[in-house]
C-alpha cells in the first residue's frame, strides 16, 4: 500500500458509518425515554441528572470536565449547573491556583437526591436492560458493543432490524464508488 492510500473503500466506510448512526439513534431513543421516566418524579432533566452524577462520582469537577464527561457543550453544562445550584444541589467555586475555571461540587442535598434516585432505579422499567436480559440469561453476561444489534432487535423487533439492514443493502446495491466518491449507479 502506498503512502496516503486508504485500506478501506468509501462504500465500506459509508455502510459502517450509517450502521452506527442508525443503531445509535434507535438505542438513544430508548435510553432517553427510560432515563426521562426514571428522573421525572424529581423534577430533573437528563442533563441535570447527568451533571449531578458526574459531580458526585468525580467528587467535584470543573465545568469543562462536566461538559467533556457529560458529552455536552460547556455553556449547556454551565447553565444546567447554575439551575442545580439555585435548587441547592450544587455549589460553585474557584480554586486559589486556578481562577480561570469554575468548579462545582455536589451538596448534601444533591447527594441525597442522587442516592434516592439510585435506590429507586427499577430495571424492569428500562427497555434497554430488558432487551439485553435474555442475552445475559443465555450467555451469563450482559452484551458488549457487538451485541447492540441483538439488543435493538429485542427492543424494536425484527422489522426494525430488517428495515435498517435493507437501507444498508440499498447502499450496497444502488451505489458505486467513482473517483473516491460514492455515487448512485
UniProtKB/Swiss-Prot annotation:
One of its GO terms (molecular function) is DNA-binding transcription factor activity. SUPFAM superfamilies: Winged helix' DNA-binding domain (SSF46785). Keywords: DNA-binding, Repressor, Sporulation, Transcription, Transcription regulation. Residues 13-157 form the HTH marR-type domain. It comes from the Bacteria. The keyword Transcription applies. One of its GO terms (biological process) is response to stress. The keyword Transferase does not apply. InterPro entries: HTH_MarR-typ, HTH_tscrpt_reg_Hpr, MarR/SlyA-like, Tscrpt_reg_MarR-type_CS, WH-like_DNA-bd_sf, WH_DNA-bd_sf. Coiled coil: none annotated. Pfam families: MarR. Residues 63-86 bind DNA. Negative regulator of protease production and sporulation. This is HTH-type transcriptional regulator Hpr. It comes from Bacillus cytotoxicus (strain DSM 22905 / CIP 110041 / 391-98 / NVH 391-98).
Amino acid at each position: 500500500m502506498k503512502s496516503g492510500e486508504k485500506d478501506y473503500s468509501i462504500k465500506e466506510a459509508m455502510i459502517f458509518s450509517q450502521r452506527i448512526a442508525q443503531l445509535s439513534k434507535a438505542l438513544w431513543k430508548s435510553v432517553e425515554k427510560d432515563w426521562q421516566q426514571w428522573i421525572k418524579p424529581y423534577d430533573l432533566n437528563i442533563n441535570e441528572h447527568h451533571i449531578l452524577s458526574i459531580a458526585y462520582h468525580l467528587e467535584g469537577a470543573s465545568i469543562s470536565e462536566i461538559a467533556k464527561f457529560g458529552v455536552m457543550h460547556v455553556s449547556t453544562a454551565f447553565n444546567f449547573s447554575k439551575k442545580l445550584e439555585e435548587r441547592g444541589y450544587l455549589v460553585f467555586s474557584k480554586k486559589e491556583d486556578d481562577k480561570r475555571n469554575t468548579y462545582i461540587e455536589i451538596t448534601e442535598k444533591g447527594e441525597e437526591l442522587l442516592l434516592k434516585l439510585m435506590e429507586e432505579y427499577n430495571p424492569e422499567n428500562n427497555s434497554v436492560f430488558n432487551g439485553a436480559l435474555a442475552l445475559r440469561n443465555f450467555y451469563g453476561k450482559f452484551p458488549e458493543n457487538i451485541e447492540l444489534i441483538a439488543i435493538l432487535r429485542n427492543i424494536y423487533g425484527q422489522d426494525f432490524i430488517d428495515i435498517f439492514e435493507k437501507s444498508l443493502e440499498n447502499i450496497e446495491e444502488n451505489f458505486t464508488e467513482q473517483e473516491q466518491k460514492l455515487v448512485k449507479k
